[in-house]
Amino acid sequence: MRLNLISFFIIFTILVSISNSQEFRSYTGEGNNKQNPKQGSIFTPFIRLANPIKFNKNGFPNITNQPSRAISNIIFDQQTHIGSKEHLTDMFNMWGQFLIHNMALSKPEPNSWPIKVPKCDQYFDPACIGNKTMNYFRTRATEVPCDVGKTVVDEDGKCYEQINSLGSYIDGNVLYGNSEEICKNLRSLSGGEMKMTVTDVGDLPPKNVPGVPMDNDANLFPIDQLYSVGERRGNENPGLLSIHTLLLRDHNRLARKFARLHPEWDDERVFQQSRSCIIEQIQKITYDEYLPTTLGSFPSYTGYDANVNAQVSNEFTTTAFRFGHSEVGPFMEYYSENGTRLQPLPIKFSYFNPHALNRGVEPLIRGLIINEEENIDIYMISDLRNFLFGKPGQGGLDLASRNLQRNRDHGIPPYNSLRRQLGLRPVQTWSDITSDPQIQNRLKNAYKSVDDIDSYVGGLAEDHMEGSCVGQTFYLIIYEQFFRTRAGDRFWYETPEMRMVNRECETTTFAEVIKRTTSNIGYVQPNVFRK
């Protein structure tokens, strides 16, 4: 009996020692890879899967296709609702946006490259003036060693790559910020909790927190009315903000739990443990629910590999993972507890609108998990294509044009060239891309040949792979990225070390997160990404 007690106290002492000395992630991503501490951290270059197109002597890509807005008008114009073939919900595209806001951000530089508007454009040049443009500022880039290969090369032989302003790991920086200073500003600094505002409709993120920079691209409301969260784009739409809210509530629930179970822990220890559990929750939802819904399946974890670079690829963030923009429907839907559809909010009025949460997150969450999203294809709703962040002529933009312009700015090669470099067979005819005659006709009207197609357009136009909601090209890019994201993360939740650290986390499905962080939510299907 005495031996058993001694053994117990030895094991307990070891566990306490491990717990107290535990290394947690940095906020910047730095130090994750011990061999290359900067790898995957903030303000480091994207990597490439394919060689970019050539740039001219002025530093601009050699483009012979029509301007981006002209392509947008031919290809992306959506007139009718086209429901998801896979019966996916609006929550699916919201999680995708939340996820990419954790992994990548291309910040602009002062160098402008305006998007030419076709004369007599219905929205942006109705008076047929013929000299209208839309603002586009080129992505910030940095000089890199030419021996890394697959980089943009200028006329002087110097090599450049666009900068990822976020850490590339799935590390919760979307909630906690990508610096210790921002995170401290968002913390209550008491009991390991995050700052929240108590309201009649539940706890919501705080507003106007000093030292926490937030975007306000629409300028519909003063910036001091916007919510403060860890990623500056958090107010882009209320669906995105609702996911922030749920996970912040869950963080504080965990903090209260750990403070109760471990009275010897200080605020910092409780906070870091709660943060680690929320990161695990985000990773688990992404790999157990989101990726199988996107790709049909995803292989099991095989362990950490320090030789794998988890940095985001340019093709992933600039091209393939922008498929989500075609999923967005014309309204933010709200539902009551008994399933009654409430007054919806048009997307064009949802941008950076803090009042969209005045009824709480519950009506919006119900809408996200009930409503079927738009199909993933070449079509994009008018509120994104003509009214992004404002009215045409009053600051409004075209998201499809911006995506195309960014692909060209980053030197993403044409569709067939990209396919070849990815090891895929190049297409010969329009019907090799899609079996849909209407999409074939739009491609023919926009491009001279299949070799001219912009990769963003070609990838969206493809027939979906069986069991997946995307075509072959985007499938490969997305699969490749998320394989590296997981394999190259020393703090991945499935490593033996992190399983020990997070043994009290009790992570669950996304459906269970919703149930425990909302009030009177009603029925929540097991897979909230599918109807």
Swiss-Prot record:
<keyword id="KW-0560">Oxidoreductase</keyword>
<protein>
    <recommendedName>
        <fullName>Peroxinectin A</fullName>
        <ecNumber>1.11.1.7</ecNumber>
    </recommendedName>
</protein>
<feature type="signal peptide">
    <location>
        <begin position="1"/>
        <end position="21"/>
    </location>
</feature>
<dbReference type="InterPro" id="IPR010255">
    <property type="entry name" value="Haem_peroxidase_sf"/>
</dbReference>
<dbReference type="GO" id="GO:0006979">
    <property type="term" value="P:response to oxidative stress"/>
</dbReference>
<feature type="glycosylation site" description="N-linked (GlcNAc...) asparagine">
    <location>
        <position position="62"/>
    </location>
</feature>
<keyword id="KW-0575">Peroxidase</keyword>
<dbReference type="GO" id="GO:0004601">
    <property type="term" value="F:peroxidase activity"/>
</dbReference>
<dbReference type="InterPro" id="IPR037120">
    <property type="entry name" value="Haem_peroxidase_sf_animal"/>
</dbReference>
<keyword id="KW-0964">Secreted</keyword>
<dbReference type="GO" id="GO:0004447">
    <property type="term" value="F:iodide peroxidase activity"/>
</dbReference>
<dbReference type="GO" id="GO:0140825">
    <property type="term" value="F:lactoperoxidase activity"/>
</dbReference>
<feature type="glycosylation site" description="N-linked (GlcNAc...) asparagine">
    <location>
        <position position="131"/>
    </location>
</feature>
<dbReference type="GO" id="GO:0005783">
    <property type="term" value="C:endoplasmic reticulum"/>
</dbReference>
<comment type="similarity">
    <text>Belongs to the peroxidase family.</text>
</comment>
<dbReference type="GO" id="GO:0042744">
    <property type="term" value="P:hydrogen peroxide catabolic process"/>
</dbReference>
<feature type="active site" description="Proton acceptor">
    <location>
        <position position="101"/>
    </location>
</feature>
<dbReference type="InterPro" id="IPR019791">
    <property type="entry name" value="Haem_peroxidase_animal"/>
</dbReference>
<dbReference type="GO" id="GO:0042742">
    <property type="term" value="P:defense response to bacterium"/>
</dbReference>
<dbReference type="GO" id="GO:0005576">
    <property type="term" value="C:extracellular region"/>
</dbReference>
<dbReference type="Pfam" id="PF03098">
    <property type="entry name" value="An_peroxidase"/>
</dbReference>
<dbReference type="GO" id="GO:0020037">
    <property type="term" value="F:heme binding"/>
</dbReference>
<feature type="site" description="Transition state stabilizer">
    <location>
        <position position="233"/>
    </location>
</feature>
<keyword id="KW-0732">Signal</keyword>
<keyword id="KW-0376">Hydrogen peroxide</keyword>
<dbReference type="GO" id="GO:0036393">
    <property type="term" value="F:thiocyanate peroxidase activity"/>
</dbReference>
<dbReference type="GO" id="GO:0006955">
    <property type="term" value="P:immune response"/>
</dbReference>
<feature type="glycosylation site" description="N-linked (GlcNAc...) asparagine">
    <location>
        <position position="338"/>
    </location>
</feature>
<keyword id="KW-0325">Glycoprotein</keyword>
